[in-house]
């Protein structure tokens, strides 16, 4: 069964292999997998995106990302979805944005991946009335947080391309943070912990032009930077892979409930242990004392950063290969696409018969 799948990214973040966010990276992996399998992949993303299949770009918002900018971007996405559905026989629409309900098609087989904490979504958006609208979590830990009344199918766990990431290199004496730069990611705490541990820290990530994000960077991150604690800005895949393979550890000081932590999986694929607060799904990703350390505060984080080189890189790689299989994730999505496409075909045949 050859499929035509329309993947729709969050309107305010570019999608592609070099994307910063986990949702955008997962979408990019699915786009590539669809094309490699001989299906038609269509991607809607804002200007600056890239795709293996057909890309429909919507305008990028040039200024502060306020509510007016969000509404403009959502309207552009609505128009792009309508254009795609008019041009191609779409089997499944796959939405990835937290604001998916703002541009949700009124009919047709639709899959929604809930990449972010479930309590960040409007409660009524998690209770679809349509039988051809399926919502799912990206981890069992996230699924367990579903509010009463939420209608979700089983989770489809995130994964990473271990073969593409793993590039064994000598470890260097620095800790690494890879993250969006915003208050809930707690990057200032990683800076404090690295300073306590007397270990250099490298930060790669993007400050999106939301007012709260730029204020956080200015007030909490920038004052803590010096010649041993550096902010590199956004990183492409090649630079990210090099840093992940050579760091003594990845630090995840997230204050939000991580739904799966793609970057933790990437670090383990590179043989790099993870030091993290036990937020959300992180205890399901990091095995304390084996592939990293789960810590309770900045002091424990500093101790774990110092101890990280004692953990075996090959154990980290082996666990990533065993537990975070990209093939398994892609297969699960393909199964969901086919099931939804059959549902759409059956509905169409029923409507024709009537």
Give names to the regions the model predicted.
Residues 1-354:
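Catalytic cores of nucleotide-sugar-dependent glycosyltransferases that transfer UDP/GDP/TDP-activated
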């Amino acid at each position: 069964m050859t499929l035509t799948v329309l993947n729709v990214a969050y309107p305010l973040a570019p999608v592609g292999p070099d994307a910063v966010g986990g949702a955008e990276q997962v979408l990019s992996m699915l786009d590539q997998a669809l094309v490699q399998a001989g299906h038609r992949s269509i991607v809607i993303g804002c200007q600056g995106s890239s795709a293996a299949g057909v890309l429909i770009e919507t305008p990028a918002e040039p200024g502060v990302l306020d509510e007016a900018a969000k509404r403009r971007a959502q309207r552009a996405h609505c128009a792009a979805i309508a254009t795609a559905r008019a041009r191609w026989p779409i089997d499944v629409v796959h939405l990835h944005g937290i604001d998916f309900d703002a541009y949700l098609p009124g009919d047709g087989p639709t899959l929604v991946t809930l990449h972010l904490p479930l309590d960040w979504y409007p409660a009524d958006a998690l209770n679809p009335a349509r039988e051809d609208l399926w919502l799912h979590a990206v981890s069992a830990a996230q699924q367990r947080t579903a509010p009463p009344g939420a209608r979700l199918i089983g989770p489809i766990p995130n994964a990473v391309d271990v073969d593409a990431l793993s590039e064994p290199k000598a470890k260097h004496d620095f800790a690494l943070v890879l993250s969006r730069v915003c208050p809930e990611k707690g990057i200032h705490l990683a800076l404090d912990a690295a300073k306590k541990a007397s270990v250099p820290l490298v930060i790669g990530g993007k400050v999106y032009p939301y007012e709260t994000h730029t204020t956080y960077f200015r007030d909490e991150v920038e004052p803590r930077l010096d010649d041993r604690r550096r902010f590199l800005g956004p990183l492409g895949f090649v630079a990210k892979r090099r840093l992940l393979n050579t760091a003594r550890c990845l630090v995840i000081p997230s204050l939000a409930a991580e739904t799966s932590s793609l970057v933790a999986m990437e670090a383990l694929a590179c043989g790099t242990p993870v030091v993290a607060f036990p937020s959300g799904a992180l205890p399901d990703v990091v095995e304390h004392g084996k592939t990293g350390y789960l810590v309770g505060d900045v002091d424990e984080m500093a101790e774990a950063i110092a101890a990280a080189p004692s953990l075996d890189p090959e154990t980290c790689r082996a666990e990533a290969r065993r537990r975070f299989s990209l093939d398994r994730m892609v297969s699960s999505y393909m199964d969901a696409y086919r099931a939804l496409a059959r549902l759409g075909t059956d509905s169409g045949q029923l409507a024709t018969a009537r």
